[in-house]
Amino acid sequence: GIDITGDSATVINKGNITVTDKDSVGVLINGDRATFANTGHIDVNNSATGMSITTSEGAISQAGSMNVGDFSTGMALSGNNNSVTLAAKDLNVIGQKATGVNISGDNNAVDITGNILVDKDQTATNAVDYFYEPSIGVNVSGNCNTVSLDGKLTVVADSELTSRIYADFDGSQENISGLVVSGDDNTVYLNGGIQLVGEENQLTDGSTVASNRNGYGKTPVITVDGKSSVYLNGDSTINGDLPLAYSGMIRLKNSAMIEIGADATINMQVDIYDHYARSESQMIFVESGAELVNKGDIDTRNIGFAAISGENSTGSNSGNITLSQYNYGLLANAGVGYFTTKGGSAVNNGTITAKVMEQESVINLGASLGLNEANTFYSDANSMMGLDAFDHGYVSNESGGSIEMYGRGNVGMLAIDESTAENAGQITLDALWVDADDTTTLRSNIGNDARSYGVGMAVGTNTYSGPRKNATVVNKQGGVITVYNAGIGMAAYGASNTVINEGIINLEKNANYDSSLGADSLIGMAAYKSGTAINEQSGVININADNGQAFYSDGSGTILNYGTICVNTNCLTGNDYNETDSYTSLLYTGGDVITAQNETQNLTQKASINDKKEGNVVNSGSLSGADIAISSGELVNTSTGTINNAIIINDGELSNEGSVAKVTLN
């Protein structure tokens, strides 16, 4: 081809360039301040390179289209401070282990106005051998480079299927990539959106790779590794046939950042979709200090939006995220808006909406599959979650945020295992909502436990792994949880797991109300398996539905009510209400006397000692009956006092000068 060495060279080519000899190069330029312009078509194959340019302060332009075949590179640019314009209508990467554009060096500016397609030719004789070897559309390495793509970046992923066997994948999906960015301070603008297209059984004989049963592959349209930024705009889509589902369409790590713009959309319209024997995944993975910012409109089916993992990894939403759940298979739930773990965090200032579009998609994990999904609150009716913090995760629904859940088995916010969830915005739950076009019915093994309808905020899990520990969710002052018809406002499962209401919980009914619903179907706060539910002094529970009740405990849980309960317009606060509800504990704080000397009292419901007010709680008489828990502060049993109740010290003190029957230090 063309071989130029030396500085300030100028090459203008108007013809086509075809490079097919092994390891050959169509245009080779080595020297600074080079100028190269080509208006013809470039076709490379067989380990060839269309343009290999090593220059600094150069000007490179390509106006013709480009096809890149096996083991080849369309354009390889190395050097600093170059200006590159690729005005080709199409850049097609169709070969095995091929790369469309490879940019290395620093401070290069690359402007691509056409479309980029990465679609390995699965009819090729070597397609099976390189099924798991990815081809790449654009590879950027180095620092401070700027890349702008005005067209659409499309990646096509093939899935090869075999016969279904129990609890194993239905086949294998290829590995393939769109944009790969490494290094620091690179900036990429994807103005035309991205597209992931699925297809199936494109290999002439895919039985070998299908029998590997690897499930979905690595199909990232965008991968960023390093402190670089990607700005995604335009309309993005996921479509075609994805019989093994997909995962990680966007992957960020090591302080990378992606912003999905305010005018951007991501929509999912698939023809075939299933992920049998594999739980739902996420569209975007963020780890090791990376950041995801969503300002756009996201509409997904049966896949979570983003997983945020690792210290200083963050996600935020000020746009709209809609999760839709269809019956694509036994294990095909729509997942989570934001899932955080291992120090990752996410905040919502926008709207997250989850809709069960087909009732049959609600799964009883244990009964239907015998599976254990550790990040699920209630495995007997599993659907979607708005925000989920698991294993040292943190999520927050800010004052401007809204989480809306429609259909059975949903949880607005969940915290499990040393995790925290906080709400200062709006959470709405309508478990009896059914989509107007839904022709399916609920599975027979989905029961009528209040948890099976849905929960606004929850801690813990009832899965086989155990409830985990030290998880906390708080409905903060200003936060509002509204539950229509059936379900629970806040629920705690497991010892050391706590839900706290400082805001408002509304129990309401609407047009979906079912008058046959009985007791324990619509609950403000509930505690299971030694969990704790606290309605603080600022907390209010409004009950405006016939089947509504403020509290529920399975007998092991603890309910502490310091706040106000309103049934229609009749409101009671603290012990004035607690004395009417056997699920709650009687509250004693500094200055209170349980029994005076020579008095006798039998407690018919649990009691709790706290330090809401200064001073000690004193007992000088004879006391029996239900358990007494010391949550904070000090209980003083004087020399004339006798306590026959079981005393449980959680976090406080007992000073005994009299007689006590049983003391347990928790």
Predicted segments with their positions:
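Beta-strand-rich solenoid/repeat architectures in extracellular/passenger domains
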Residues: S8-D23, R33-S47, E57-F71, N81-K97, ...
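Glycine- and acidic-residue-biased ligand/ion/polar-headgroup-sensing regions
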Residues: G615, G633, G652
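Conserved acidic
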Residues: I416
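Cysteine-dependent hydrolase recognition
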Residues: T5, N30, S78, S104, ...
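Short aromatic-glycine motifs in intrinsically disordered, low-complexity regions
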Residues: I284-V286, F339, G494, A527
